[in-house]
Each structure stands twice: as structure tokens, then as C-alpha cells.
Amino acid sequence: VGAAEFGAMSGKAVCTGGSILRPEATGFGAVYYLREVLKHDGKGIEGLRVAMSGYGNVGWGIMKKIDELGGKVTYFAGPDGYIHDPDGVCGEEKLNFILEMRAKDPMHCKPYADKFGVDFVEGQKCWGVKDVDVYMPAATQNDVNMEWAKKIAESGVPYYIEVGNMPTTNDALAFLMEQKHLTVAPSKAVNACGVSVSELEMAQNAQRIYWTAEEVE
């Protein structure tokens, strides 16, 4: 047995010493990363259309920050299929409903379509849709395999931003990185903000203080 060493837990609830914005941090950071990628090409998030997978903490954070910066998530997928909302997941009503929906049943996103009268495609993923500007896989590992990667390449969409942990199979990622029209951002860089805010959480704990949302962000 080695020497005893002090450790720390992160991702705690705010009431037990956690940091404000920790649940949203990975999603917010992914959008900030995307903003820098777009800036390099002389573009911005205003008017941007996003197709993504997932609506957990990370996915919800993406939806919220994209909305705040003037873009919109027009497609999002869950385990049971995908949603197409041409107006985007925008505004408090829709964003709050996402929170309620996943709390009641995280395996089904169809209730969103029922609530807001938009399209739901059962048993499919949204990779390959053409009327968006960026794809952001933010759910499970290996979400995008070679079959979906080919659809993504054929769509002509110019940006593929990995947000989840290893959301793309190795062969699919290699294939996507070969596409000259496609800018690919790897997950280890894109989702680093979650870990960064964990560090900020421990810094707050060490000082026995809480930072405001503005200070954390």
C-alpha cells in the first residue's frame, strides 16, 4: 500500500461544493470551440444551423449556447430516432422542455415532436441531412460509423465537430479527415471545457468560495 494522498471529487452538486455551470460546461465549451473554427474561416454562429445527437447535459448545453449566440439546433437525435425542428430548439420553453423530457424518460425524444408539432423520424440518425452547416455528435461512443460517415461526406456539410467521448469509429474518423471539403475537430480538444471547469471547481473548493456563472464562463 502506497502513501496516503489527498484527492478531490468534481462534478458535485452546487449544494455540496460543486461549481455553477459544471453540467453545461462541456456543451458551452464545444460551442466556443466551434466559434473559433468558424472565425478562422471568416464566419460566425449567427444564423448557423446545427444537427447533433444527444440531449443530456452536453447536448442541452450546446442547444442553449447556440441559441444564445444566434444559431439554432434544427436536428437532434436520441435513442428512438431524430427530431427536425426547422425553427430550432430556441427559447426557454423548448429548452426547459428538453430538461423535463430527459428527466422523465432519457430514452425517447419523440415527446418533443408531440409537444411542438415538428417532425420525428423513428429509428434513424440525422447524419447525412443536407440543410445544416455543422454536425455535432454529442451522445454515445461510436455513434458515427463508416456507413454514417459516408452519408456525412456526401451531404456536403462543411464542419464535423466531435463533442462526445470517441463519438466516431476509428475508420470513420480517418475517412472523414480525408475529405477535403470537411473541417473535422477532434473530441479531445472540443470537449476539454468540462475538465477545465472541474479544475475551476476544485479551485473554488480550495478557497471555500463560489464563483458566479459569469466568473466561471
Segments predicted by a language model, with ranges:
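Rossmann-fold NAD(P) dinucleotide-binding segment
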Residues: 120-134, 142-159
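Glycine-rich phosphate/diphosphate-binding loop of Rossmann-like nucleotide-binding domains
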Residues: 12, 21-24, 28-131
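Generic hydrophobic/aromatic pocket-lining and core-packing "Φ" positions
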Residues: 34, 63, 148-149, 173
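Adenosine-phosphate binding glycine-rich loop
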Residues: 153-217
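N-terminal ligand-binding/catalytic initiation module
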Residues: 1-20
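Short glycine/serine/threonine-rich phosphate/pyrophosphate-binding segments
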Residues: 58-62, 143-147, 168-170, 192-194
